[in-house]
Amino acid sequence: MLPIISVLIGISLMYYIRQKRAEKEMDEIVNSISPSNDSNENIGTRDLCLELLRQLNCEVRIEHDDIYFTYQNEKFMIEASNDSAFFTIWDLHWDMVDSENIQDVENMKKAVNRTNQLVHNTVLYMSYEEEKSYYILSKLQCLLMHNIPNTKAYLSATLDDFFRTKQCYSQV
């Protein structure tokens, strides 16, 4: 009977030690996470966008409610409000197709449809009758809040995805 009690005590002790070690590791993880900056908690999406774009060294121009900026030599536009956590990024007019060339128009439409199946962004085309052309553009609606970890890297990765979209479109 004594050996069985000894084994049970040994197992209980091992379990207790493992639990204490797990608690200690969890406490270390929690303590290593920097507390959120209270001054950023009240910042709205639009203001956060502007702050992050400046941190990314983007040339920023505000026109009415829209934010125009250059990121890696590409022109973008953001629609954002401090009243909503969502914003829309537009990559405007990055390709053009002559509307009189039927074959190019058909290829463009197929490429737009196929690209929309493969990427996160939405690829669109707009017809300009006076110029007799179609312009290709893309957009992405996403969430941006101060408590997303590393918001600068998040926005940068989101913008980088537009380059992937163009690459995908050109390869279709």
What are the language-model segments listed below?
Residues 71, 91, 140-144:
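Short beta-strand-to-loop capping motifs
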Residues 106-120, 141-172:
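Ampiphathic alpha-helical segments that act as solvent-exposed interaction surfaces
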Residues 4-81:
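Charge-rich, low-complexity N-terminal segments
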Residues 91-139:
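Short, internal acidic amphipathic alpha-helical interface segments
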Residues 43, 99-102, 148-153:
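Ordered, soluble secondary-structure elements with a strong preference for glycine-centered loop motifs
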Residues 66-68, 85-87, 134-136:
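Hydrophobic residues embedded in beta-strands of well-ordered beta-sheets
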Residues 78-98:
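A short acidic-to-branched-hydrophobic micro-motif
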